[in-house]
Amino acid sequence: MTLAIDMVGTNLGSGTRTYNTNFCEYLEKKTFNEKIYIFITKNYKADTNTQRDNIKYIIKPNFLTNIFFRVVWMQFFLPFELKKLKVDKLYSPMNFGPVFLKLFKINFVLALHSNLPWVYFSKMPGNIIRNKLTKFMMEKSILACDSLIVDSHFAKNEIVSMMNIKKDKVFVIYLGVDQKYLSPKENNYFLNNFDYKDYIISILSCVRYHNIINILKAFKLFKKDNNNTRLVFVLQILDKKYFLEIKKYVDNNFFHGEIIFLNGLDNKYLVNLYKNANLFVFSSYCEVFGLTSLEAMAQNCPVAISNTTALPEINGNAAHYFDPDNIKDIKESLRILIANKEYTKTLILKGNNHFKKFNWEKTVLETCHVLELN
């Protein structure tokens, strides 16, 4: 069998990039005989370093990360490239793929990492045309694929219900914690002019469904009794309009230095930001997995998190939960994790055992089973 993997939609700094870089790294460690072609963009090639004769990277121009160009290439050019390479199966871990592969007699396996278009369409970043195109392509790809991989049982149940597809077509494969959070070596990457004490951290994309303003409202209440604590956001800004709303709220409600934004930060600094934080908070409305809470657990950082969607499934009893719409509940969660040292210590111990259940070697092994790689 000849397999192709389409990773052309990968953007620098995106969660999909985390998936794809780890997938490639662990795939190259696995023994198999099949020929594999991996389609990637130029700015992504630096993250790959294969020494395998049976794995070949096919480099595509960076402009294909734009969804409009990507759709055209994927639907009208990629199938012919696959046919020319005599590919038997395509794996697309990018939420959608070519919808006419059956005409080319090519098996299609899709991985879905989002349910946003169906449950929180109005909170998606980007313009409405882009978002409608994304939803349309995801729906058509789900119906067209031969097998579908999702990140949680919550995601499987939701997709099966919304799209009316057969359960036995859908496989649940959990993601893993990135190796940089697991290394026993001491991490020496520290930010200049940053005080690594008395702060709460939230690492997330700046999008409306991540509910950042509710964190700020809760923190404003929390500050009345915890004046020295700061709130630090490490953001990837995907919705500029929403970020301006956040900045306006901060300017009107907080003194200078109480809220810190670290935008577009290199991932190498995250280990020590997690490790030295008083706690990690994540108030998302909608997740089919969510890696950052597990990363926090790996650095002995207690986690306060939304009680919605897949988050309870993924974090189990190793996190403290709150209602993301209830400002007082979020505030009380922050207070408890700061004030109740014994409870926080128990959460840290649970988290330290819990995150170890999620590793990329297992993710790749289970995916290879679905792909029938021997």
Predicted feature residues:
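Short alpha-helical donor nucleotide-sugar binding micro-motif in glycosyltransferases
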Residues: 82, 272-277
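Membrane-proximal helix-turn-helix segments that form the acceptor-binding/catalytic region
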Residues: 128-148
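Conserved donor-binding/catalytic core segment of Leloir-type glycosyltransferases
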Residues: 194-219, 232
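Nucleotide-activated donor-binding/catalytic signature segment of Leloir-type glycosyltransferases, i.e.
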Residues: 244-268
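Aromatic "clamp/platform" in nucleotide-sugar-dependent glycosyltransferases that forms part
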Residues: 285
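Conserved acidic donor-binding segment of nucleotide-sugar-dependent glycosyltransferases
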Residues: 320-327, 336-341
